Amino acid sequence: MSNKGQLLQDPFLNALRKEHVPVSIYLVNGIKLQGNIESFDQYVVLLRNTVTQMVYKHAISTVVPARPVNFHPDSESS
C-alpha cells in the first residue's frame, strides 16, 4: 500500500489506540468483532478484548468507534 493510502488510516487507528476507544470491526464476511485497538501496522490490527486477536486489514470492511474521536489526518504523532 502506498504512503498516501496510510494518510487517513494511520492517524485514525492511532487516535483510537491512544484514547482507548472501544471499536466494532466488521469483516468482509459479515462477522463483527469488538474490542480495543492495541496496535497496528501496514497489514494487521491487534484487537484486544478477553484475548488479543490479529486481524488482517484486507479482511476488514468497517471500523466503527463507540464514541466520536478527534484525529488529524495531516499530522503524524506518536
Curated annotation (Swiss-Prot):
GO annotation (BP), single: regulation of RNA stability
Keyword RNA-binding applies: yes
Gene Ontology CC annotation, any one: cytosol
Alphabetically ordered keywords of this record: RNA-binding, Stress response
Record's keyword annotation contains RNA-binding: yes
GO MF: RNA binding
InterPro entries xref list: Hfq, LSM_dom_sf, Sm
Gene3D superfamilies in alphabetical order: 2.30.30.100
Location of the Sm domain: 10-69
Role: RNA chaperone that binds small regulatory RNA (sRNAs) and mRNAs to facilitate mRNA translational regulation in response to envelope stress, environmental stress and changes in metabolite concentrations. Also binds with high specificity to tRNAs.
Subunit structure comment from the entry: Homohexamer.
Family: Belongs to the Hfq family.
PANTHER family recorded: RNA-BINDING PROTEIN HFQ
HAMAP family recorded: Hfq
The protein, known as: RNA-binding protein Hfq
Species the sequence originates in: Paraburkholderia phymatum (strain DSM 17167 / CIP 108236 / LMG 21445 / STM815)
Taxonomic lineage: Bacteria, Pseudomonadati, Pseudomonadota, Betaproteobacteria, Burkholderiales
